[in-house]
């Protein structure tokens, strides 16, 4: 997972309704609503995100001979995400309307998504002292984060990427 949380108020907005800050033209919404300060990304209030990911991988493995084995795992994925304080980006979103009436960008609490993938693996003993392993996991196509469709490319898409793994085990001495 990933979690960040920063306090708001690092950038002064001057008098309410007066456009005179480093965030000028970036976040007119906060000035219009009477904000007196911004966070580091020209939004209002605290700034942060929270992403949690869980992958369940029930595995079937079998030896194909005395030195090699193969495994397969269906992957079941679950994600939870929330963002806060990103209202400074509202002007850059594809959603029409004002931030107050059409918010699929920030401050919506937790949203979740799920998806599926596959992992294949191999392990082989090359000698009495060297064993290699390799695995490949497909991209996990996840359902979209509908509450944050203006934040992510693909209107809320946040897939888990494919990945490759390699490993080597070396037995330094027969005593180990």
Model-predicted regions and their roles:
Residues 1-176:
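Outer-membrane beta-barrel porins/channels
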